[in-house]
Amino acid sequence: MTNKISSSDNLSNAVSATDDNASRTPNLTRRALVGGGVGLAAAGALASGLQAATLPAGASQVPTTPAGRPMPYAIRPMPEDRRFGYAIVGLGKYALNQILPGFAGCQHSRIEALVSGNAEKAKIVAAEYGVDPRKIYDYSNFDKIAKDPKIDAVYIILPNSLHAEFAIRAFKAGKHVMCEKPMATSVADCQRMIDAAKAANKKLMIGYRCHYDPMNRAAVKLIRENQLGKLGMVTTDNSDVMDQNDPAQQWRLRRELAGGGSLMDIGIYGLNGTRYLLGEEPIEVRAYTYSDPNDERFVEVEDRIIWQMRFRSGALSHGASSYSTTTTSRFSVQGDKAVLLMDPATGYYQNLISVQTPGHANQSMMPQFIMPANNQFSAQLDHLAEAVINNKPVRSPGEEGMQDVRLIQAIYEAARTGRPVNTDWGYVRQGGY
């Protein structure tokens, strides 16, 4: 491949996708956000993990082509005409290096179309993945997907504030929707998305990849089997140093695009993880936040935030996220019989869990042996396909995404006021774990 894409292509004009380049200008109109193209910034290494975990074939740590990490060979492909067709909306680093390669392990799904504000980039990606160039759309002609019966669903991988608009447009086009987390930047937008899905009689699934990760599911199974005993405490920590010089990260520092800082981006893993590990909803939250007033990265969004949640069972949780401390992804669940440790807890491929009992630690880690069928991205993509084919509910529906956004807003309120906030809203989880 000799084609090259500059990382500065039309940088000042638009935001093209999640983990892609963000506008350097204050002009944040919808046209500025979605109308222009952006370049391919060099992707960073995958989330760090222990050597006990093995990556799938072809999962190089650093992308080696302009279209991101190469897609590994699909060892058990189904006939293409029997697969569920996705249109990928947004071609940022996450789409290029995780989602698109993830289709190699899918048994029921295929890449049918691409949607991007950068035509040159889209053509390169389409060529590498065998997508018909006539199936390349941009943000202005996105609604034409309604005329393509081979597109069954769209996967929205755009900045948070654009999720609602493109989800609603997709439903109006008669397509199912998978949307990246957080679901939206407001509870009102979440409700609009849910209402649009119901009106179109289509499925809405939020891309909570850890719900489909073998290690996270194994952790839930251990807890549900009472291996830890009565649960008392959950602690989560998700942190990463925000590089404001990385064009792919700049939109995350703009409140109008991101809706918030580290909590909306990475803290949500701990928030959602606490809920699915405990299997219940918090009834009260408290929170504290801090951003260095001299750090220009955090003029609009928070850097560090910690929150505590109280549950009806008596369990308590402590969550933390940060944009200025070294990368961590760590969960701990304490019961009266044992402690479950997850470190890394929310990595892409190398999550590990262990159980420690009183008097000694059981250090026999349970590594995630990755096969394409167990890849969390492949499993997530196929889950929506199977739910549609079999007319079953999805594991991570829109209501689940809205609950997290509502809790995030409550956490921000608690941090702002310095008072506890009641969250006993009577929410009942749908879809199960």
UniProtKB/Swiss-Prot annotation:
Tell me the pathway: Carbohydrate metabolism; D-sorbitol biosynthesis; D-sorbitol from D-fructose and D-glucose: step 1/1
What are the EC numbers?
Answer: 1.1.99.28
- What does the record list as GO biological process? sorbitol biosynthetic process
Superkingdom classification of source: Bacteria
Q: Which residues form the signal peptide?
A: 1-52
> Keyword set for this entry?
NADP, Oxidoreductase, Periplasm, Signal
Q: Which GO terms describe its molecular function?
A: glucose-fructose oxidoreductase activity; nucleotide binding
Question: Where do the segments described as Disordered lie?
Answer: 1-24
How is the cofactor bound here?
Answer: Binds 1 NADP(+) per subunit. The NADP(+) cannot dissociate.
Q: Which cofactor does it need?
A: NADP(+)
Which Pfam family is one of this chain's hits?
GFO_IDH_MocA
Post-translational modifications reported in the UniProt record? Predicted to be exported by the Tat system. The position of the signal peptide cleavage has been experimentally proven.
Question: Reaction catalysed by this chain?
Answer: D-fructose + D-glucose = D-glucono-1,5-lactone + D-sorbitol
One GO CC annotation, please? periplasmic space
Q: Which InterPro entries match?
A: Gfo/Idh/MocA-like_OxRdtase_C, Gfo/Idh/MocA-like_OxRdtase_N, Gfo/Idh/MocA_Oxidoreductase, Glc-Fru_OxRdtase_bac, NAD(P)-bd_dom_sf, TAT_signal
Q: Provide the top EC class.
A: oxidoreductase
Q: Where is it chiefly localized?
A: periplasm
Write out the annotated subcellular location.
Periplasm
Q: Which family does it belong to?
A: Belongs to the Gfo/Idh/MocA family.
Instruction: Please describe the quaternary structure of this protein.
Output: Homotetramer.
What is this protein called in UniProt?
Glucose--fructose oxidoreductase
- The species is Zymomonas mobilis subsp. mobilis (strain ATCC 31821 / ZM4 / CP4)
Q: What gene does the UniProt entry assign to this protein?
A: gfo
